[in-house]
């Protein structure tokens, strides 16, 4: 069922100016839907929790969130946030990306089809193009893992 487990991770890229951007990607493991992609120059643990609250506003919170052991995901801020919402935090083992196969697969498609296809001039342009790609991913692309339906 939807909202059982969300997986999240970071993908990094750079603008044409050389300035780095950081994308927080969140996927529903059951529906394969891209729940959200947050695009910023930097993303703190607190910003991760704010983004998750925004993503949950219209769809509800997941029962669990799967992620790697990155600093933003293992700090006190996220730990308190999941505790307050009765969400289980599932940290994968270090060096075992196959334990989060859904988000790794999504991130590969995101990099190949969006990030590698565009040379963003600004953070605003990156956000617009990434949002358009996400919309297409969710609304028009069939996914073999769910019987060639769209999420």
Predicted regions and their residues:
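Charged DNA-binding/catalytic regions of mobile-element recombinases
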Residues: 1-151
